[in-house]
């Protein structure tokens, strides 16, 4: 096993091969990575079978689905890499140019961060997404996967590095930390001088640990306590469709809905219809029904478990939905601001004034009007695959694409000027 220190030194030694690579060279490298990923399908699936067998019975079925790979999912990962090839290279972009009275010309240019560390949990597709985005944005990357997905991640990284071996980019610009202990995560948090940026992708425990302990710069990819508010002026059919999609299409992801707020004027008519769609119809179709966690008012209209206080502060990542009836738009917004993780929140309404109030007052990275929160995604936003969803305000916010993985520098051109 290569030590963490050796890996940090290896990536530092070769980072310039990607930091200063041309767009053509980077694109050739990405295409080779995608081709080798597909070519290694058999090996990746064998590794994934080991991870799945080890995880079965230890994690939920929803989490098992996040871990699971098949040939179609591997092809989708390769397609994601190829989509990054089609995106414009951000490196070298001139952001601003100005000329001072003394003749100095100051140009603000976009540059690579350098080396980016990613700590993430059991999601194999993050491996290929992270590698593609970091390399296209001119960065080397150090990956630290969750233990549950290590065999799969190792097979994916092996394929990606074999692709790089056919190009002029050194394969060591992608590093996978072999030690899956907690100590390896903390070592990355303390790797000042080796990592220029650290991005955690996972649950609240992981993200909080990184934010609280890291001495390297961090972009916080927050958990998603995502709300949908059904206003008194909502179109109920529209609301049913949006909620069904936001909650059931993929409940294990961070942009999935976790909390429903319903105006009291809508509760009696809307909640029974919602129960029919999310519970009865799903049972009839052989699908897992949604379990409701209901406040006292909501429980008057539908069946479910009484909500505990913590249910409105929980990212369930499962077929569970907390439901609260509110007396006004203002109460809905106040609840969201008290409980939201500032990821994605939505209002369903036909009232333009209510929509404007909601979008002005809700301080989240993505605020929706009459649309599913599942659109908070780099691909859906036209950014290609994403590095994560930032819930902080400094440097990056919302889906992080190529530009969010860069910095800038000032190039100052003169003709012998000196400061008086």
Curated annotation (Swiss-Prot):
Identify the species of origin: Streptococcus pneumoniae serotype 4 (strain ATCC BAA-334 / TIGR4)
Reactions that this protein is recorded to catalyse? L-glutamate 5-semialdehyde + phosphate + NADP(+) = L-glutamyl 5-phosphate + NADPH + H(+)
- Pathway membership: Amino-acid biosynthesis; L-proline biosynthesis; L-glutamate 5-semialdehyde from L-glutamate: step 2/2
Question: Which family would the database say this protein is a member of?
Answer: Belongs to the gamma-glutamyl phosphate reductase family.
- Matching SUPFAM superfamilies, A to Z? ALDH-like
User: Which enzyme class?
Assistant: oxidoreductase
What's one GO-annotated cellular component?
Answer: cytoplasm
Q: Could you tell me where this protein is found in the cell?
A: Cytoplasm
A Gene Ontology BP annotation from the UniProt entry: L-proline biosynthetic process
Q: What is its EC number?
A: 1.2.1.41
Q: GO molecular function terms here? A: glutamate-5-semialdehyde dehydrogenase activity; NADP binding
Major place of residence: cytoplasm
Function (record text): Catalyzes the NADPH-dependent reduction of L-glutamate 5-phosphate into L-glutamate 5-semialdehyde and phosphate. The product spontaneously undergoes cyclization to form 1-pyrroline-5-carboxylate.
Q: Does the keyword Hydrolase apply?
A: no
Designated name of the protein? Gamma-glutamyl phosphate reductase
Alphabetized HAMAP family for the sequence: ProA (MF_00412)
Recorded hits in Gene3D superfamilies, A to Z, give: Aldehyde Dehydrogenase, Chain A, domain 1 (3.40.605.10), Aldehyde Dehydrogenase, Chain A, domain 2 (3.40.309.10)
């Amino acid at each position: 096993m290569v030590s963490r220190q050796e890996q940090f030194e290896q990536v530092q030694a070769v980072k310039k091969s990607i930091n200063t690579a041309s767009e053509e060279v980077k694109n050739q490298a990405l295409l080779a990575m995608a081709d080798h990923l597909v070519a290694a399908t058999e090996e990746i699936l064998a590794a994934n079978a080991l991870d799945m067998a080890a995880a079965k019975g230890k994690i939920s079925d929803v989490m098992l689905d996040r871990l699971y790979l098949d040939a179609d999912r591997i092809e989708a990962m390769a397609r994601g890499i190829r989509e990054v090839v089609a995106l414009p290279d951000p490196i070298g972009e001139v952001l601003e140019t100005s000329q001072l009275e003394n003749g100095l010309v100051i140009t603000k240019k976009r540059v690579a961060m350098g080396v980016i560390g990613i700590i993430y949990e059991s999601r194999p597709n993050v491996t290929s997404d992270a590698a593609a985005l970091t390399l296209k944005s001119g960065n080397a990357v150090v990956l630290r996967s969750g233990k549950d997905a290590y065999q799969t991640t190792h097979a994916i990284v092996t394929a990606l590095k074999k692709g790089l071996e056919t190009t002029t980019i050194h394969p060591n610009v992608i590093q996978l930390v072999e030690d899956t202990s907690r100590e390896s995560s903390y070592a990355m948090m303390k790797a000042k001088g080796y990592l220029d940026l650290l991005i955690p992708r996972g649950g609240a425990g992981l993200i909080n640990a990184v934010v609280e302990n890291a001495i390297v710069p961090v972009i916080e990819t927050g958990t998603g306590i995502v709300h949908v508010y059904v206003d008194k002026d909502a179109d109920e059919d529209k609301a049913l469709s949006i909620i069904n999609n936001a909650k059931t299409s993929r409940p294990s992801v961070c942009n999935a809905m976790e909390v429903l707020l319903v105006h009291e004027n809508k509760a009696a008519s809307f909640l029974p219809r919602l129960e029919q769609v999310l519970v009865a119809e799903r049972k009839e179709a052989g699908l897992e029904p949604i379990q409701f966690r209901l406040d006292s008012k909501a429980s008057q209209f539908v069946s479910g478990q009484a909500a505990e206080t913590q249910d409105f502060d929980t990212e369930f990542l499962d077929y569970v939905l907390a439901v609260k009836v509110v007396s006004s738009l203002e109460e809905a917004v106040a609840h969201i601001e008290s409980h939201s993780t500032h990821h994605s929140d939505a209002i369903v309404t036909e009232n333009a004034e209510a929509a404007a109030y909601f979008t002005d007052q809700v301080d989240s990275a993505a605020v929706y009007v009459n649309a599913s929160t599942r659109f908070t995604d780099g691909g859906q936003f036209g950014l290609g695959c994403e590095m994560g969803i930032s819930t902080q305000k400094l440097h990056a916010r919302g889906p992080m694409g190529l530009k969010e993985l860069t910095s800038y520098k000032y190039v100052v051109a003169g003709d012998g000027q000196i400061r008086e």
